[in-house]
């Protein structure tokens, strides 16, 4: 049939058609026959287009999963934060699909030979500060460059020109008109960029001296504020047939009409996402759907498009909202319903924790355009701010936001000679439409080995030793320790200070902010944004800073605690509804308020032309509108009492919820007792009132912003007046709940009518001398306790004295013990000593007031709580109690509640114990207004360097973060007992706006940015420390555990 004689047609067997492998060693071919071409191929050659437009070839087995290819790409790029990225390709319908890691590639891509996959950013974080590596930020900048060119990142022409100018600065260095114009002729950044050419050049002139890393950061900072940042449209229509676009982001599912966002379904509102054929369904929580129907329906183009969008939503939700990946469900034996698709990478939380906890070593890299042109400042004036990496080992850490990232520059950049470039001919191809340059992947590989055997493959964290490279003298100037940036450095004993206390470490959480690593930061920045001198600007800035902290506090409940209870299915549905239906609306409101304040402050700090407009130098209109809206939330605030009560009851009834609750309180993100965060919404209202009073006091009645601020103050005062009694009741309930958990040996501490008055450390006279005890004064009784087993957070009840019939007398002369007084109770008499005369006066005043109140209360006093430990036989009323037992005896008795050997030691109870002081109910109430957040510079102890930290002051404690986006603090410093003052001449501090914190031998210096912020920090710290009182060391005849502890801390600090 037309076949040439002597040849044979090869017939496919059933096994060949099904893809079965031919047995090796036995040939079934006739002489002269060969295998089919597709049978000869043992590997697929996949082309991947990287973000710098270079092409790479990857060889993989045909049946391997997508993860194999992804792993090869990450390895070749040396990309550590790989979970932000993915591989995308176009299907036959020409829309982009993400390569699935857990699915075979040949089941996803029909013709792998003809498909070009491209590396792309998959998850866009809300803030570039969350990206840990400089290399990751560089890749993100390249992604935004691609989005600009493909018109995905739509924005105003001026903004597009500004972004392009920063990209130019990053790629070719400082402004040079001839070079700029030539570069822009060859490289396209914007569609029709000729129209914006002059504006791009004008902006580029202003970036002189800006390093590539700083330029990348500026690109990300500008882009993240745009509406279309990270948005990928999926065409759809609603039930009425209106054409819309769906998208997904870190906050939830978004709905657009054109380029206008018309709705946002936040993750906290969404109960379930599903699809059925072409219909995409969003099921809302019953308590939040409001005027909407329970389930919203959108129609996409096809089933595949619908399923693709659903998968992206699942991945975004898991990555940004969950603490870790959900456990895979067991497969059905016979039938399965629905998709088995799950996100298979690390969550953002896991990724950030991995970097913070693992001490990753950063690998240097080289930019694609680094050989074109280099900023002069990068080579000379600001060497520490721009890290220059030589293959021979010269490396200096620096970055706009990450001190551990590295930027590499090849020696050919410094010596523009005719040296040949390396070329990876084995695995690098060039797209005909792509400039032929060496990819960062190849450059990172070559950079790792170019130095030969003497070159270290990876530098340790911290300041590496500067090693001379070729052509560099060993006498080259080295950056001083104070001119290098670093993360917050802690001594080894306090490396994880906010999680559970480690066994063997000091129980007092007093961070030693040391110079470990030798890294510092010179606070003299060469360029500053324009800062208005008006005090109102700094008040608004305080509103913004404290609002950011407040939102983070709310997220402890709305995001982190919700995730914990949902994951374990530990909370009853009724309590879930009660809790989150009261917190979520408040959280959403404050998110919008924060956005408004951020935008207004950005205009306030903006260029002088925009700044001359009076509308930008005001905040009253925003405050008035939002303070009035807060009135509508009064009913939510009023139910927080019920929420707190029901949560406490549920934890007692449900052991699973109790376990999740306790476990969650040990997490770093829960830096205060969990129920404390339920008080934050009402406490925040008092803070608004305080700041509005400051604004009104600053403005004259004729000021254009005075009227709005005055009306806003009036509105918020009405709300706080209504809620004042609720806050008092809430604070008391929260404190009793906290004590019930931490005190062992007492039942039913929470009772109607019982009020907390004071807690603190006194020394009780026993036969063995003065023994340290923790005392708790309530409206009807006085408890005293001893510290439980070492390493636990519990105090064991040692005695309960009713206030009825109690008498308190001074007894300094009788016992020859300073600051002592005697407490006569109905069945017992004890002698106690305070640390100072001030402490003694506070205790005696509160005791006498409480005794008088209990006497006048009569029969209305609550029943005394029961004891769960054996009590001693009653003594004669005239007998003075001289206890036989000591702290060693106390360790012999241990309750089952003390099973949790880990605890958080920055609560007021533990700080009072170790600082030998006390705190009253009035002090706690005053601390509500003494809250502050903002950036401070902390001075290193052993150098002249300063380190920029985000600092939060709340609950008598300073919490330190690297940036305001961090989810949990790196360290904390309880301030009870500390004094705050201005440095003396002997301290050698020659800077403005510096204040000094001191407790015994522990001294810290912090520097504020302005006179106003300096005075505010001094005010709030003085208000907290003076109200609670400072406690110098006590002269004792007996043991002094607190002194020994401070000595241990001091020894570690030195």
From Swiss-Prot:
GO terms for cellular component: cytoplasm; cytoskeleton; cytosol. SMART domains: B41, FA, FERM_C, PH, RhoGEF. Residues 755-852, 929-1026 form the PH domain. The keyword Repeat applies. InterPro entries: Band_41_domain, DBL_dom_sf, DH_dom, Ez/rad/moesin-like, FA, FARP1/FARP2/FRMD7_FERM_C, FERM/acyl-CoA-bd_prot_sf, FERM_2. GO terms for biological process: actin cytoskeleton organization; cell adhesion; hair cycle process; neuron remodeling; osteoclast differentiation; podosome assembly; Rac protein signal transduction; regulation of integrin activation. Keywords: Guanine-nucleotide releasing factor, Phosphoprotein, Repeat. The modification Phosphoserine is found at residues 389, 439. Residues 468-492 have a biased composition (Low complexity). Functions as a guanine nucleotide exchange factor that activates RAC1. May have relatively low activity. Plays a role in the response to class 3 semaphorins and remodeling of the actin cytoskeleton. Plays a role in TNFSF11-mediated osteoclast differentiation, especially in podosome rearrangement and reorganization of the actin cytoskeleton. Regulates the activation of ITGB3, integrin signaling and cell adhesion. Intramolecular interaction between the DH domain and the PH domains can stabilize the protein in an autoinhibited conformation. Interacts with PLXNA1. Interaction with PLXNA1 or PIP5K1C lowers its guanine nucleotide exchange activity. Dissociates from PLXNA1 when SEMA3A binds to the receptor. Interacts with PIP5K1C via its FERM domain. The interaction with PIP5K1C is enhanced by SEMA3A binding. Interacts with RAC1. This is FERM, ARHGEF and pleckstrin domain-containing protein 2. The gene is FARP2.
